[in-house]
């Protein structure tokens, strides 16, 4: 991937791409605030959480097939461009607190693509968040998908039921119709991730019950 093609318009990118870019812009906003308030430790934790929880364990894992071989379709191009943007931005965000690794990551990226003429991440402009890229509703929905998936997988491990063994149903407690609507919007994603045939909603219960 050399990033020679024009950017795929945001409106034409899949929801999962728009989500990670929304979270990325939220991260830029929060990390910039941390640095301005002399809170480098907090900034580092935010960057670490983004890379581990959102980028690696969720975005990359859910999109493995898009990155694999096959024709270079717009969908695949969108995935590559989105991931590249995340990595390049993370390199810039972490540069003040992890100067050597950030510089290596940034140098590797721009060497492959030639997208920047500067020779070091420390000479590049610090990222600026784009408010129009932030979709809080989408972030909330995806966070719920992550939370439910994490709990169900933890329950599977607890009772020693492997993910490849399908479950008939999980019952998810919801506190109101808004929460139910958010989870309903990502229900198929949850079902695929935990290998379950049906999601049912229950009122007032605590935790997630596996049936």
Language-model segments: residues:
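Feature 926 captures the class I aminoacyl-tRNA synthetase adenylation module centered on the KMSKS loop
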Residues: 1-211
